[in-house]
């Protein structure tokens, strides 16, 4: 017993650091702070002592060059001067996790910003974690119900699937995210608002999400006026919180807005650290970081994280670098059309340009056939829509086109849905059955 006790203290003494290694700031270059020492590793937190303000500034090691440590602050660098002491904290960024987070709005570092008091959670989780072993992932066979008619039928989503929502500005992606968060059958929703305007955060919480959606949600906000490192770490914080609830056996929905602003923040960090710009000014580190973040969602034995990532498409160009890179990583993409939005067609989902790569695994045979009929009708009508509108098409010339025209009005009603309208899954199946004339005997597997 005494030997075990002595062994415990011996280990504690061996791992303790009675002497703190202290470095000193040597230069401040824009976002980047350079110091000589201390001994630290990339990703480690450091405390910069501001001599004139009497408070510490928390920064993170983003690069090393010989004895020079390159740091980036989580806040602005006001008050930093040459000679300020830099102390390594010996740990990376971690955030509190637990049920106490539900219904709360947090900043990028897991601290409450909603005025409801401090969050007391006994557990903490590091935000920078490696993605799981691919052999630990489970096949995706169960459908997640979103409460959005077009997604639950024509673009079915599986539990653990990752989808990109591609959209220009002002086309309704925040409204669509709010609809999904309110109506989903997921146990917990984690919502990351990265790089948003401050006004939009409150608008989303009050109007798009609402009190009902907030009860089972955790919101992580890192607004556009915060440092690029705070915006990037906010993305990882939201993902780490989602992983915690997944490990508790929950089916988790992760809504991320927006991946483009995350990429731009990562670009700022890369440029400040000395990376050379590549495609459209994005540094190579951006394209290295995207899969590391996105691969953390998925289906596992404990639970699943189903993720929707919005991509703000510059100039409505779906082939711009970030859109192209994300489309190659996710398991499907939902394209929001400005033309549909201008016609007051909401949600403005362009079904023909959108695809769910795992829909065939979660839909039953009857649903697959109904979806095939609807998509075919949409495609046939789209080919000759201009001719039909100007009256140049003569009815009876093409039987398939005649059927598509006859279905058009009902299709429009099926594809549109009010922002506050909640559609039960069985009602979606019934509507699809009436639209196609098929008897859908069984719902998608797992529902």
Swiss-Prot record:
Keywords: ATP synthesis, ATP-binding, Bacterial flagellum biogenesis, Bacterial flagellum protein export, Cytoplasm, Hydrogen ion transport, Ion transport, Nucleotide-binding, Protein transport, Translocase, Transport. ATP binds at residues 167-174. GO terms for molecular function: ATP binding; ATP hydrolysis activity; proton-transporting ATP synthase activity, rotational mechanism. Its EC number is 7.1.2.2. It catalyses: ATP + H2O + 4 H(+)(in) = ADP + phosphate + 5 H(+)(out). CDD domains: ATP-synt_flagellum-secretory_path_III_C, ATP-synt_flagellum-secretory_path_III_N, ATPase_flagellum-secretory_path_III. It is found in: Cytoplasm. It holds the Pfam family ATP-synt_ab_N. NCBIfam families: FliI_clade3, fliI_yscN. Probable catalytic subunit of a protein translocase for flagellum-specific export, or a proton translocase involved in local circuits at the flagellum. This is Flagellum-specific ATP synthase. It comes from Treponema pallidum (strain Nichols).
């Amino acid at each position: 017993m005494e030997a075990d006790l002595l062994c415990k203290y011996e280990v504690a003494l061996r791992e303790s650091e009675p002497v703190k290694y202290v470095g000193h700031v040597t230069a401040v270059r824009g976002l980047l702070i350079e110091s000589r020492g201390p001994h630290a590793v990339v990703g480690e937190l450091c405390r910069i002592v501001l001599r004139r303000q009497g408070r510490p500034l928390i920064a993170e090691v983003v690069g090393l060059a010989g004895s020079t440590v390159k740091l980036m602050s989580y806040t602005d660098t006001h008050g930093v001067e040459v000679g300020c002491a830099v102390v390594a904290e010996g740990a990376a960024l971690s955030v509190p996790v637990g049920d106490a987070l539900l219904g709360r709005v947090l900043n990028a570092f897991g601290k409450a910003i909603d005025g409801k008091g401090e969050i007391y959670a006994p557990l903490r989780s590091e935000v920078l974690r490696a993605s799981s072993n691919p052999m630990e992932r489970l096949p995706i066979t169960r459908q997640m119900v979103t409460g959005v008619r077009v997604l639950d039928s024509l673009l079915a989503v599986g539990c653990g699937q990752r989808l990109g929502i591609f959209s220009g500005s002002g086309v309704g992606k925040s409204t669509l995210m709010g609809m999904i968060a309110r109506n989903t059958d997921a146990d917990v929703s984690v919502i990351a608002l990265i790089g948003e305007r401050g006004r939009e955060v409150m608008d989303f919480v009050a109007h798009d999400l609402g009190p009902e959606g907030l009860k089972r949600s955790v919101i992580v906000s890192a607004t556009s006026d915060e440092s690029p490192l705070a915006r990037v770490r906010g993305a990882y914080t939201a993902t780490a919180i989602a992983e915690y609830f997944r490990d508790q056996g929950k089916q988790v929905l992760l809504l991320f807005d927006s991946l483009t602003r995350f990429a731009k923040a990562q670009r700022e960090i890369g440029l400040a650290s000395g990376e050379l710009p590549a495609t459209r000014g994005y540094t190579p580190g951006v394209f290295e970081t995207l899969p590391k973040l996105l691969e953390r969602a998925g289906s596992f034995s404990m639970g699943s994280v189903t993720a929707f990532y919005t991509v703000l498409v510059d100039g409505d160009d779906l082939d711009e670098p970030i859109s192209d890179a994300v489309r190659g990583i996710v398991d499907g993409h939902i394209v929001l059309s400005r033309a549909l939005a201008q016609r007051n067609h909401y949600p403005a989902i362009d079904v023909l340009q959108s695809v769910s790569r795992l829909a065939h695994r979660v839909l039953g045979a009857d649903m697959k056939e109904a979806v095939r009929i609807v998509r075919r009708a949409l495609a046939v009508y789209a080919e000759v829509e201009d001719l039909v509108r100007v009256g140049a098409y003569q009815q009876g010339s093409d039987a398939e086109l005649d059927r598509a025209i006859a279905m058009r009005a009902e299709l429009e009603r099926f594809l549109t849905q009010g922002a506050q309208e909640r559609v039960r899954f069985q009602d979606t199946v019934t509507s699809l059955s009436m639209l196609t004339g098929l008897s859908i005997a069984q719902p998608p597997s797992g529902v």
